[in-house]
Amino acid sequence: MAKAYVVAVYSKIIDPEKLKNYLQDSRCVMGAHGAKALAIGSNISNISKLEGIPPERAVIMEFEDVEAAQKAFQSNQANEEKLEGGVDRVMFVVEGV
């Protein structure tokens, strides 16, 4: 089975305190589902001037497979609701090759 990668791109952090609390609570849930953080941070640069404005924060996590990633985020639903309105974010899962 192919690994899965969850990518979260935070275009805007509206409420840093909500994000801080979300991250503290979510780390335990994600870890319990085998998540491995590959990249977390806000030190983001464009590759070229044509790429637009870089996000304020980005996260990449590795899971054993897509199903494990989906289960982790289903288990984390209560934390997701606490983050509501705290960030503008796009999050998706990509199956590895």
List the predicted regions and their residue ranges.
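C-terminal structural segments of small proteins and small subunits
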Residues: 69-87
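C-terminal end-helix/capping segment
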Residues: 84-97
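Short S/T/G/P-rich N-terminal loop/turn motif that feeds into the first structured element of a domain
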Residues: 1-70, 95-97
